[in-house]
Each structure stands twice: as structure tokens, then as C-alpha cells.
């Protein structure tokens, strides 16, 4: 088993906000999205299950206006933050692909 790969510092994700990240060697598209709620972080692949396109409106902006749901910038699909389940839109019933992570020493690591 390989060592966990660092993704970001916890402070890189605003509390009650989101940010996007890519790993070394990627083509600079945001490959992961992270949504923070206090000391809890939810990480998903930045890919809509409906079209496969990135979800962010602008780099790192994934949340609906009220911050309660993740919202796809292409067709307006909305997903629960806690589990990535689509509650409305063309992919209703599908889910975002969750990414396993851990928080350690103020950093977020991909497992």
C-alpha cells in the first residue's frame, strides 16, 4: 500500500466553502473538489455523472448560492454535500464519486 498523497492544507478550504485541486502531473484541470464543514471535509472527483464535465462555476466554486448543495455549472444538477447524491437535475439518483481522504497535522491527504 502506498503512502497517502498530500492534497492541500486544511486552511486552503474555507470553512463552509469549497475549493478545487489537481495532483502533480495532471493536465491542470481541477480533478478534485473539497467541501469543508468545520473539521470535516468531503472530497469528490470534479466530474458530473451526467456529462462528465467539471462541476465548478469558476475555479474552486462548487456550491449553490446558499452553500447548502453542490451544484453543477452545466445543467444545474444539485448534490448533497455529505454523500454526493444527486437530489435534482438530469442525473437525479446518481452520485458523485467520493475520494477517500484523511486529515492529519492540518493537511488533507488522498488515501
Describe the function of each predicted region:
Residues 48, 72-75:
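Short cysteine clusters
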